[in-house]
Amino acid sequence: MTNMTQQSHGNGSIEHYDAVVVGAGVGGMYALHHLREMGLSVRVYDAAAGVGGTWWWNRYPGARVDGPGSPFYCYTFSEELMQEWDWAETQPSQAQVLTYLEHVADRFDMHRDIQL
C-alpha cells in the first residue's frame, strides 16, 4: 500500500513518503526497487543530473569495474533483466555500467520517484 500524502504548509505543500533514499547510485536504485516491491511510497534524492552515483560522476579515462565477474553480483533488479542484458566485457567500462543503470531506471520507471 502506498502512503504518500501531501499537506499544505504556508506557501507550499509538504509531501510525506514511507521512505526517503539519499543517492541514486546502484544502492539507492536497488533500495527504491525493493521498497516499491514492499508496497511503500519512496522518494530518492540525488545531487547529480542523472542516475548512477559513482558511475555518473567518475568519467575519467579508464574508469571501469575492477573486480572479477559480473559487475552487479549483489544487486539483481530482476532475473529477466540479467538474462537479457549482454555485458560486452567481464569488467565493463564506466560508460557501459552507466548505460546499464540508465536502462534499469527506464525499465522500472524509477525516474518518477527520483528527484535530481
Q: Which residues does each predicted region cover?
A:
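Extreme N-terminal leader/targeting segments of oxidoreductases
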Residues: 1-19, 37-38, 66
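N-terminal Rossmann-like FAD-binding beta1-loop-alpha1 element of flavoenzymes
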Residues: 14-44
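Non-transmembrane alpha-helical segments in soluble domains
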Residues: 33, 52, 98-105
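Short polybasic/polar patches that bind polyanions
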Residues: 36, 56, 106
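Glycine-rich active-site loop/strand segments that organize a redox cofactor
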Residues: 41, 49, 56-100
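A structural signal for short, well-ordered beta-strand segments and their strand-loop junctions
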Residues: 43-46, 115
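A conserved beta-strand/loop element that lines the FAD pocket in flavoprotein oxidoreductases
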Residues: 106-116
